[in-house]
Amino acid sequence: MSKLKRNMGLGYTKERREELLSETRLGILSIAREKKGPLSVPVWHRWDTETGELRFTSGINIRKGEALLAAGRASFTLLDDDSGYVMLEGPVTYDEEYDFELELVGTGMRYLPDSGEDYVRSTYMNEGKPWPGIVLWRIKAESWLTYDSKASRAS
């Protein structure tokens, strides 16, 4: 029996994966759940190159927040325009006190340049503060899986 040669492709460099994570792209957050499939939802995010953390704001008392608290870990996947991807995985923590302008309003403005600030302030804030239970979630990237389709085609 002959062995099949498998071409698993090439991964992104650290610089390219951080560049992709810093772009304004919708990513998919996946959280393992007991006796169920994973909860996978799209999220707006912000990549912090200094800390190596993926950051996003969301409710703590909603299905996503409850799943994050129960699992304590999550993964996040982002596609590039050429069928490549970057996936990170790691422990999840949250902060109730955070820089609202940067993390909540700033992220909204990244994704909706013309209306993001108004959208976030009218949907997630009251009198300049986030609604109770809107927290900053952080995933500390411990493991990576990436695929660079351009590099794989060239090799």
Predicted feature residues:
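Amphipathic alpha-helical interface surfaces
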Residues: R17, K64-A67, F100-L104
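Short, basic/aromatic recognition patches
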Residues: S2-I28
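A generic secondary-structure signal marking the coil-to-beta-strand transition
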Residues: R17, R25, G52, G84, ...
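Short, charged beta-turn/beta-strand-edge "cap" motif at the junction between a beta-strand
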Residues: D80-D82
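Short, intrinsically disordered, mixed-charge
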Residues: L69-A74, M109, P113
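Charged, gly/pro-rich active-site loop segments
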Residues: M1-Y12, Y85-S155
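Short beta-strand segments
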Residues: T24-I60, L68, A74-L78, M87-P91
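Structural motif corresponding to alpha-helix initiation and N-cap regions
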Residues: K14, N61-I62
